[in-house]
């Protein structure tokens, strides 16, 4: 499936890391804990994550993995660092930060998530007022801010080279969409 997405220029996201198969709590309504040792998870629950190719993105699960620490993975620096190390440094997006498993104001949830090292904080539910507060809490995207601080004007050749490097890192190539793909022949 992910290979098919990748061939059409769409990036898939593996979710929910470190897995939800051992929890009985729905993280929309409460915080779940996984007490299984990491070496056991590596030989069982994480095998599918390692076997699947075609993506460089992972979404966190709002669970505590007690082997790493006592914080939800999404807001845990130790957990985010462990995911990056174990799964070859993926881009990491949080699950929705309005879920009950993550506590605090929406501002605190966004700040704690980004401070833990998550690349993108997801806000997919809630009111417009909460959404606006989440955006303000996030501020300028960190990579954009860091890039802007050291930005030098680039030629179009240099920009094209940077885009090609990004495409190579992400494992995609520019695709031309067929606008008639969904029409009967």
Each predicted region: which residue ranges?
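Short linear clamp-binding motif
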Residues: 166
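A mobile, often basic/glycine-rich helix-loop segment
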Residues: 163
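Long, charge-rich alpha-helical interaction segments
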Residues: 157-160
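Second-shell residues forming the walls of enzyme active-site clefts
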Residues: 1-146, 150-153, 169-179
């Amino acid at each position: 499936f992910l290979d098919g997405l990748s061939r059409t220029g769409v990036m898939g996201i593996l979710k929910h890391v470190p897995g939800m198969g051992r929890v009985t709590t729905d993280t929309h309504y409460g915080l779940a804990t996984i007490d299984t040792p990491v070496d056991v998870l590596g030989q069982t629950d994480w095998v599918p994550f390692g076997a699947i190719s075609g993506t460089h993105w992972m979404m966190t699960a709002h669970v505590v993995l007690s082997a790493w620490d006592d914080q939800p993975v999404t807001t845990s620096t130790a957990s985010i660092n462990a995911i990056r190390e174990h799964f070859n440094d993926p881009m990491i997006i949080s699950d929705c930060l309005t879920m009950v498993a993550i506590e605090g104001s929406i501002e605190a949830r966004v700040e704690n998530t980004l401070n833990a090292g998550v690349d993108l904080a997801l806000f997919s539910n809630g009111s417009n007022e909460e959404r606006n507060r989440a955006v303000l809490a996030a501020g300028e995207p960190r990579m954009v801010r860091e890039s802007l601080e050291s930005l030098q004007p680039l030629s179009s050749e240099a920009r094209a080279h940077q885009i090609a490097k990004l495409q190579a890192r992400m494992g995609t190539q520019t695709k031309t969409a067929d606008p008639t793909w969904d029409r009967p022949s």
